[in-house]
Amino acid sequence: MNLAVIGAGIAVLTGLGAGIGIGIATGRATEAIARQPEAASKIQTALIIGAGLAEATAIYGLIIAFMILTK
């Protein structure tokens, strides 16, 4: 097995971390909105920004995996 394939597989694992992080953040945001419904818009804004940043790391990992495999 080529080391490039292993490296690409490891790069794709960033999606796993992003998925776990977004799941935890969404759960906590839901709890926070349930406790303080009047702050829902601020919590939702922070959640969307954080989820976007977390998802960006997964996309970067996928791009790097494609770059490694097509080299």
Curated annotation (Swiss-Prot):
Provide the GO MF annotations for this entry: lipid binding; proton-transporting ATP synthase activity, rotational mechanism
Q: How does it sit in the membrane?
A: Multi-pass membrane protein
Q: For the site Reversibly protonated during proton transport, which positions are given?
A: 55
The Gene Ontology CC terms held by the record are: plasma membrane; proton-transporting ATP synthase complex; proton-transporting two-sector ATPase complex, proton-transporting domain
Q: Where, per UniProt, does this protein localize?
A: Cell membrane
The record ties this protein, via PROSITE patterns, to: ATPASE_C
Oligomeric state and interaction partners are given as:
F-type ATPases have 2 components, F(1) - the catalytic core - and F(0) - the membrane proton channel. F(1) has five subunits: alpha(3), beta(3), gamma(1), delta(1), epsilon(1). F(0) has three main subunits: a(1), b(2) and c(10-14). The alpha and beta chains form an alternating ring which encloses part of the gamma chain. F(1) is attached to F(0) by a central stalk formed by the gamma and epsilon chains, while a peripheral stalk is formed by the delta and b chains.
Among PANTHER family, the record links this protein to:
ATP SYNTHASE LIPID-BINDING PROTEIN, MITOCHONDRIAL, ATPASE PROTEIN 9
Kindly provide the name given to this protein in its UniProt entry: ATP synthase subunit c
- The protein's organism comes out as Clostridium botulinum (strain Eklund 17B / Type B)
Recite the lineage of the species: Bacteria, Bacillati, Bacillota, Clostridia, Eubacteriales
Gene assigned in the entry: atpE
